[in-house]
From Swiss-Prot:
This is Ribonuclease D. Keywords: Cytoplasm, Exonuclease, Hydrolase, Nuclease, tRNA processing. The gene is rnd. It comes from Shewanella sp. (strain ANA-3). Residues 230-310 form the HRDC domain. It is found in: Cytoplasm.
Length: 388
């Protein structure tokens, strides 16, 4: 049976009697199904998750918080391994999903639910687009808008341990309770500035591609310092990075707990041919050598040296990079000031690199982010005039 706990917090001071709130600890299927049936009729649903991630590739989901303005639920995924009924809420187009700084939550939804929330309203992005500052934390946003001070003391606790403490439950409930109260303020500000569409566009961008499986053949491109290697060495790195990713997924281990990046780079450079060669490497731990040594030697023998990858392209090393980067950054900085948009939203290093790569590739491929959607409306004309 589900436990009921009473949280004496008012959603709207003018409607005290109507909105005295109950939060429900959901740990059985019947309660979950009843809750989902209610939420399916709600126009707005606040979502948050609590999880643990230490050595694992995937986060370990410890709790799901949800609130529709009527019932605040703390859903126990440890007691409820089958949450398919709940996941069906995520892509219901009639329910706005309200979250805060949700990139890690989206990872959880993708892994456990195989779905992404849509339409998505991220309050951190909303605050940025409203001119309240970039990257505002939840506690700071609540204090700024509602005058409430939130205790964040439970944020690093063990969410997999049972039973959860009253302090953990209260902390988790507050994460969605106050977010529900923030929504009207943020939505009104965005509407007044005609930027609500921008916010939902950002939600679509954040969820795009989240359900795709990791690309094994390009895993080597995500290894730190891969750009240092020759084509011959990259052939070894490619098979090693693919093997490491496969191993990490199979054992649910963070990549660094299989072999760290610098270990892969060392193997690709030194190319051990025997266990004796491998044991001499100082860049691998004794545990890595003992557990993975034979596998490493076997995998390295599969490297396709006749058809190696191309050298990793490093934009910052190209002639003219510094001046081009500076010109683009100056242009975008002026536009950000003109439109009261944080530089991180329009002119981040990633945005500039993506645009510059596109320009130098003679405008091949899909449009860079800074030329797409609302960003393109603001920046496309000015950027086209630059000589880069």
């Amino acid at each position: 049976m589900s436990r009921l706990l009473f949280l004496w917090t008012v959603l709207n001071p003018q409607e005290l009697e109507k909105n005295l709130s109950v939060f429900q600890y959901v740990s059985d299927e019947a309660s979950l199904n009843a809750l989902v049936a209610q939420y399916q009729q709600s126009p707005l649903l606040v979502l948050d998750t609590e999880f643990v991630r230490t050595r694992t590739y995937y986060a370990k989901l410890g709790l799901i918080q949800a609130y529709d303005g009527k019932t605040l639920a703390l859903i126990d995924p440890v007691a409820l391994p089958d949450l398919s009924a709940f996941w069906s809420l995520l892509d219901n187009p009639n329910i706005i999903k309200l979250v805060h700084s949700c990139s890690e939550d989206l990872e959880v939804f993708a892994h456990y639910g195989q779905r992404q929330p849509t339409p998505l309203f991220d309050s951190q992005i909303a605050a940025s687009l409203c001119g309240m500052g970039h990257g505002l934390g939840y506690a700071k946003l609540v204090e700024t808008c509602l005058g409430e001070v939130i205790d964040k003391g439970e944020s690093r606790t063990d969410w997999m341990r049972r039973p959860l403490t009253e302090a953990q439950l209260s902390y988790a409930a507050n994460d969605v309770l106050y977010l529900y109260q923030l929504y009207p303020q943020l939505a009104d500000k965005l509407k007044a500035q005609d930027r609500l569409g921008w916010l939902y566009e950002e939600g679509e961008r954040m969820t795009e591609g989240r359900l795709a499986t990791p690309d094994m053949d390009t895993a080597y491109l995500r290894v730190k310092n891969a750009f240092q290697l020759t084509e011959h060495q990259l052939a070894y790195l490619k098979v090693l990075a693919k093997w490491r990713l496969e191993k990490a997924l199979a054992r649910d281990l963070a990549l660094g707990f299989v072999i760290k990046d610098h270990g892969l780079i060392a193997l690709a450079k030194k190319q051990p041919k025997s266990m004796g060669d491998l044991l001499k490497l100082n860049d691998l731990t004794e545990q890595e050598k003992r557990i993975h040594g034979k596998d490493i030697l076997r995998v390295m023998q599969t490297a396709d040296l006749s058809n190696p990858p191309e050298l990793v392209d490093v934009l910052a090393l190209k002639p003219g990079y510094k001046s081009a980067f500076k010109n683009i950054k100056t242009c975008l900085s002026e536009l950000c000031e003109q439109h009261a948009i944080p530089m991180e939203m329009l002119g981040s290093k990633r945005h500039i690199h993506e645009y510059l790569q596109w320009r130098w590739d003679k405008q091949q491929g899909e449009l860079p982010t800074v030329l797409s959607g609302w960003r393109g409306q603001i920046a496309a004309e000015s950027l086209a005039k630059l000589d880069v």
